[in-house]
């Protein structure tokens, strides 16, 4: 299996937009880049975390595609990558010649702050939210390697450096390690400039 086209919309906040409203323009760009018509698509896999049931079916309906299997994958932040894996598998196993993988989510629907987790989750029952969990893992990483938080700040520096040249990036302004370390703390060691932004 090979990727013959890709498309996306700029990362950002799109209040009032729907899942199809976010995905359809990106899919159309991917189809154009691939030189593929919607009628050639043999299967669709849609990865998301918070879209609910039938997210992929709603997107496909808005694209005017019918009569193909649509699988929805809820795999948290790995939903899009999982969709790509499953679409490639459809091709490799000879089920279809052309498969469409979609990764889409709408995180601003929660109004900011931490993302909601299910109450049955053992970490949630202990009061853990994702920033706290990642902070614990970061503390352990630094401890085991004898490093300071400066090493983690380099991740923000690298990500922002790549964002400067990417017209689809949510943030396109560079940041220094000192700025990342001096930013408002979220859960020690990560600061606000070291946490994932909320967006679509």
Describe the residue ranges of each PLM region.
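Generic N-terminal amphipathic, Lys/Arg-enriched alpha-helix
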Residues: 1-15
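Structural motif
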Residues: 3, 45, 100-102
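Short, glycine/acidic-enriched capping/hinge loops at junctions between secondary-structure elements
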Residues: 13-17, 56-57
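Short catalytic helix/loop segments, enriched in acidic residues and glycine
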Residues: 16-34
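Acyl-thioester C-C bond-transforming condensing/cleaving domain
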Residues: 36-38, 53-54, 61, 65-200
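Short glycine-rich phosphate-binding loop at a beta-alpha junction
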Residues: 40-48
């Amino acid at each position: 299996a090979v990727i013959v086209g890709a498309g996306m919309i700029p990362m950002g906040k799109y209040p009032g937009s729907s899942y199809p409203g976010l995905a359809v323009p990106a899919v159309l760009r991917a189809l154009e880049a691939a030189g593929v018509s919607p009628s050639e698509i043999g299967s669709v896999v849609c990865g998301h975390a918070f879209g609910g049931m039938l997210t992929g079916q709603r997107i496909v309906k808005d694209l005017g595609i019918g009569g193909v299997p649509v699988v929805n994958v809820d795999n948290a932040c790995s939903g899009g990558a999982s969709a790509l894996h499953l679409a490639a598998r459809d091709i490799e196993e000879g089920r279809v010649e052309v498969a469409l993988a979609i990764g889409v989510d709408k995180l601003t629907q929660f109004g900011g702050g931490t993302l909601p987790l299910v109450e049955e989750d053992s970490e949630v029952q202990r009061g853990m939210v994702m920033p706290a969990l990642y902070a614990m893992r970061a503390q352990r990483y630094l401890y085991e390697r004898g490093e300071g938080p400066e090493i983690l700040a380099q991740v923000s520096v690298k990500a922002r450096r790549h964002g400067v040249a990417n017209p689809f990036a949510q943030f396109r302004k560079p940041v220094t390690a000192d700025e990342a370390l001096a930013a408002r703390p979220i859960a020690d060691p990560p600061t606000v400039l070291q946490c994932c932004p909320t967006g679509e």
